[in-house]
């Protein structure tokens, strides 16, 4: 029951991090300002002359206080040193944040809530540092860091709170009761220190239960789109640590603590309420205190400096003991930051058998491109625990290795994608001691029992046994990744299943699948995965657009495309750059339904301001970014087709606006109950199909881009003339496309550039059908009409920087090259609009270069040279009649 309450609390805190953090900070500020209204303005030494303010402090007290401070600093140093052994800098950062905020809360309580002076912190902070325990904070952080997604982060934080919360609560209660005994000693300094200790425990407990889990959840959520190759919380080697015994409370210890707590409660109750001193003694003591106060009355004085200068001077003036403490802290900090890195790395390398030389020495000569760590059997005698564990892991690999198909072990090139530590973390999960898997497949019943066992699972089954279960229909082939301990093993088994059904079993030999972060693919980008397709990525640029320079990534297998686009970018740059504007921004899915009461009546109602306002309110309520702009309707018999045009922020927007469309239809159904919805999409959008409606009305981002190329650049870079390019553009792009009955195809090869950028940047490649709509216009300009004016208008660029393939790390790298990765925080939607402008500008560069090649007669020659380099084409003549003068 108690664990369930803590679990609910942890889930709430992790699910609402902003609310909890803001509430905690607000409460802290309230405590800071509480005595501004209830307390007095007496500050000894500034506006009051207090006779008792300057007290003689015994040298023994100074020595004890200095030793206490040094011990506290050493204690914190060793705690952080232990955290570094885990090999994660994120735990260090989170633990440091926990320490800083706990100290801030505690200091606030001491200074303001109890109306204490800053001098009280000299005694308070050492005890706070001695009582803080980062092990619990790091344990909760490890729960969160073992997650693969944000939802799993919340669940793991809730699970960690359920496990650690009751234990931590009991520990805090026991510590407060034990330390609180000192407040009844009658020794004033001991009572003050014990009071500080109790407040330290309570402040730490408060932060651990509220601010810390919320902050962990928020930090990991903001770090989802990490630049380091994978999400920072994917530290899979923590998963096994979390299942260990250290997080499970010892029932014997818990009972002892409960009994101790009850005994201490009785002690406190007897001392504070039952054994109160007699009223006579209290009266006498009070009279003595009052007499003492009368003799030492504080006198108000005029401040000579401002309050902040007074506090600053007190903090700057340092005694010898403060110098000693600060020097020790600085020395340890320098040692920790600069001199322990190499030592820690060497220690971690010794603890990690995957990175040891014994592990990696075998495959060095086999294939330099293939990274497949294989453990080597060593017949020497070992005596350490680490080496014995390594031998057990080697035996396990030797048992599993013969089950791999022969084609998998053959030498072949394998591409490396993502962080190399991903393999290590995945292999760490599989390498557990004492896992013996027989070479012969076991019966299906036994395999099913092992698979359903929560403590064993698929890692205790061989690949042959998994294939046997799939063939027997016990495991669906599409669920292999979710049932295996690693996604990569699921992909490997599917490849083995598929290879047996192909005409050529070795067909998948050159399709790589290793070293890829499949956690970003599953449930988002692809199903039934058998590998990934490496495509060459070139760069064109710099593209000078709107006063900025962009290096444009292009993924293509067409020779000359990147080189041609790069030449166009150079010509635009020499001409002073290009300018672009967004003409419209919106996505337009469609719904289709038969006559609700009458199609014309519904159409007329939707065209009224009242009807549009009702639909817009329902539509806008489904998203922070989707905002309905207008409705466009068309009637065909009994059917009514509606185009919803809406802004979609930085996303491409189909899913976002489909959700808004469903909500709007539900609201429309309330006004017309007899309405019947046939399909959410009725092809009036139109999505991924050539259509005049997108060419005329626009879809996604509508962009126009223009540039002026000087005559000198046309002659020297493009190797042609303005007159020739204008004539070819009219006869090819305009007249030729019209003769072909083209819709939106009044360009030379816009689809080439659009598709190459889409593949490189994680866009939906099929969207190039509508996104490639473009009209290229050229005309002579300048004083002598020798300069070339070129413009490209693209009314339907469907593009986004969040969601879909943009979550994959290689595609994110290409988006980062352009500075548009993820959502724009300052102006939602700006990244997607900027990417659309870059696409249009790059298309214009490609159009410029290709039209120049056509005008100069270089197109066939360049393609034949680059794509068929063995053919001698020195005497090949151009094919165009118009050439450069």
UniProtKB/Swiss-Prot annotation:
Its EC number is 1.1.1.34. There is a cross-link at residues 89, 248 (Glycyl lysine isopeptide (Lys-Gly) (interchain with G-Cter in ubiquitin)). Its main location: endoplasmic reticulum. The active site is at residues 558, 688, 764, 863. InterPro entries: HMG_CoA_Rdtase (IPR002202), HMG_CoA_Rdtase_cat_sf (IPR023074), HMG_CoA_Rdtase_CS (IPR023076), HMG_CoA_Rdtase_eu_arc (IPR004554), HMG_CoA_Rdtase_metazoan (IPR004816), HMG_CoA_Rdtase_N (IPR023282), HMG_CoA_Rdtase_NAD(P)-bd_sf (IPR009023), HMG_CoA_Rdtase_sub-bd_dom_sf (IPR009029). Keywords: Cholesterol biosynthesis, Cholesterol metabolism, Endoplasmic reticulum, Glycoprotein, Isopeptide bond, Lipid biosynthesis, Lipid metabolism, Membrane, NADP, Oxidoreductase, Peroxisome, Phosphoprotein, Steroid biosynthesis, Steroid metabolism, Sterol biosynthesis, Sterol metabolism, Transmembrane, Transmembrane helix, Ubl conjugation. It is a multi-pass membrane protein. Residues 40-56, 115-123, 188-191, 276-314 are lumenal. Residues 61-218 form the SSD domain. One of its GO terms (cellular component) is endoplasmic reticulum. Belongs to the HMG-CoA reductase family. Catalyzes the conversion of (3S)-hydroxy-3-methylglutaryl-CoA (HMG-CoA) to mevalonic acid, the rate-limiting step in the synthesis of cholesterol and other isoprenoids, thus plays a critical role in cellular cholesterol homeostasis. Homotetramer. Homodimer. Interacts (via its SSD) with INSIG1; the interaction, accelerated by sterols, leads to the recruitment of HMGCR to AMFR/gp78 for its ubiquitination by the sterol-mediated ERAD pathway. Interacts with UBIAD1. This is 3-hydroxy-3-methylglutaryl-coenzyme A reductase.
């Amino acid at each position: 029951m108690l664990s369930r309450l803590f679990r609910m609390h942890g889930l709430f805190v992790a699910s609402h991090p902003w609310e909890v953090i803001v509430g905690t900070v607000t409460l802290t500020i309230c405590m800071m300002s509480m005595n501004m209204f209830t307390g007095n303005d007496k500050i000894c030494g500034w506006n009051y002359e207090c006779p008792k303010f300057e007290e003689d402090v015994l040298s023994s007290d100074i020595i004890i206080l200095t030793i206490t401070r040094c011990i506290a600093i050493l204690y914190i140093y060793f705690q952080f040193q232990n955290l570094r052994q885990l090999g994660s800098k994120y735990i260090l950062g989170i633990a440091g944040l926990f320490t800083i905020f706990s100290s801030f809360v505690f200091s606030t309580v001491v200074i303001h809530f109890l109306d204490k002076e800053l001098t009280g912190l000299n005694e308070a902070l050492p005890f706070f540092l001695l009582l803080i325990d980062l092990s619990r904070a790091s344990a909760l952080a490890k729960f969160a860091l073992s997650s693969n997604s944000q939802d799993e982060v919340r669940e793991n934080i809730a699970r960690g709170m359920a496990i650690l919360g009751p234990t931590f609560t009991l520990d805090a209660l026991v510590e407060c009761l034990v330390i609180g005994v000192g407040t009844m000693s009658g020794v004033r300094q001991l009572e003050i220190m014990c009071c500080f200790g109790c407040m330290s425990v309570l402040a730490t407990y408060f932060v651990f239960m509220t601010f810390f889990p919320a902050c962990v959840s928020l930090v990991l959520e903001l770090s989802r789109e990490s630049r380091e190759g994978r999400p920072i919380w994917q530290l899979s080697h923590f998963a096994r640590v979390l299942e260990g015994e250290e997080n499970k409370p010892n029932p014997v210890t818990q009972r002892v603590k409960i009994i101790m707590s009850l005994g201490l409660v009785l002690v406190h109750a007897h001392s504070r309420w039952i054994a109160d001193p007699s009223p006579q003694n209290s009266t006498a003591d009070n009279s003595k205190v009052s007499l003492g106060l009368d003799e030492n009355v504080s006198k108000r004085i005029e401040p000579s400096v401002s309050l902040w200068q007074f506090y600053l001077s007190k903090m700057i003036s340092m005694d010898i003991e403060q110098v000693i403490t600060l020097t020790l802290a600085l020395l340890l900090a320098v040692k920790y930051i600069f001199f322990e890195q190499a030592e820690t790395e060497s220690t971690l390398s010794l603890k990690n058998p995957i990175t040891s030389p014994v592990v990696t020495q075998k495959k060095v000569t086999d294939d330099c491109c293939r990274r497949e760590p294989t453990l080597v059997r060593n017949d020497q005698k070992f005596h350490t625990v680490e080496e014995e564990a390594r031998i057990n892991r080697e035996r396990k690999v030797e048992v599993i290795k013969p089950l791999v198909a022969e084609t998998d072990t053959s030498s072949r090139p394998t591409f490396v994608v993502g962080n190399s530590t991903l393999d290590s973390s995945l292999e760490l999960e599989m390498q557990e001691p004492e896992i013996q898997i027989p070479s012969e497949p076991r019966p299906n019943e036994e395999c099913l029992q092992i698979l359903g066992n929560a403590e064993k699972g698929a890692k205790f089954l061989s690949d042959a046994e998994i294939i046997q279960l799939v063939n027997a229909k016990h495991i669906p082939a599409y669920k292999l990744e979710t049932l295996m301990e690693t996604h990569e093993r699921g992909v490997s088994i599917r490849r083995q299943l598929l290879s047996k059904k192909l005409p050529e079993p070795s067909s998948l030999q050159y399709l790589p699948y290793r070293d890829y972060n499949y956690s970003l693919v599953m449930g988002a980008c692809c199903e039934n995965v058998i590998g990934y397709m490496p495509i060459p990525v070139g760069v064109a640029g710099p593209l000078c657009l709107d006063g900025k320079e962009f290096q444009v990534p292009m993924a293509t297998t067409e020779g000359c495309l990147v080189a041609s686009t790069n030449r166009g970018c150079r010509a635009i740059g020499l001409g002073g750059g290009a300018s672009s504007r967004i003409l419209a921004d919106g996505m337009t899915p469609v719904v289709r339904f038969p006559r609700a009461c009458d199609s014309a009546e519904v159409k007329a109602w939707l065209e009224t301001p009242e009807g549009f306002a009702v639909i817009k309110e329902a539509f806008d309520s489904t998203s922070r970014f989707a905002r309905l702009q207008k409705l466009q309707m068309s009637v065909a018999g009994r059917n009514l087709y509606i185009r919803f045009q809406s802004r979609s922020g930085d996303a491409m927007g189909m899913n976002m606006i489909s959700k808004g469309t469903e909500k709007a239809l539900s609201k429309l159904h309330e006004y017309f109950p007899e309405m019947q919805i046939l399909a959410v999409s009725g092809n009036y959008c139109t999505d991924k199909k050539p259509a005049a409606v997108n060419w005329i009305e626009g879809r996604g981002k509508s962009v126009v881009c223009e540039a002026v190329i000087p005559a000198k650049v046309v002659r020297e870079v493009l190797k042609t003339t303005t007159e020739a390019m204008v004539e070819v553009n009219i006869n090819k792009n305009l007249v030729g496309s019209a003769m072909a009955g083209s819709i939106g195809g009044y360009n030379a090869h816009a689809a080439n550039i659009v598709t190459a950028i889409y593949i490189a940047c994680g866009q939906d490649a099929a969207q190039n059908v509508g996104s490639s709509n473009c009209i290229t216009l050229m005309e002579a300009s300048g004083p002598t009409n020798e300069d070339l004016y070129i413009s490209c208008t693209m009314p339907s660029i469907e593009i986004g920087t969040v969601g879909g393939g943009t979550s994959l790390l290689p595609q994110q790298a290409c988006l980062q090259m352009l500075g548009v990765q993820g959502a724009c925080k300052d102006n939602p939607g700006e990244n997607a609009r900027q990417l659309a402008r870059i696409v249009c500008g790059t298309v214009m560069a490609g159009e410029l270069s290709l039209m120049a090649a056509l005008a100069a007669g270089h197109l066939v020659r360049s393609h034949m040279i680059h794509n068929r380099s063995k053919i001698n084409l020195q005497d090949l003549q151009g094919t165009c009649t118009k050439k450069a003068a």
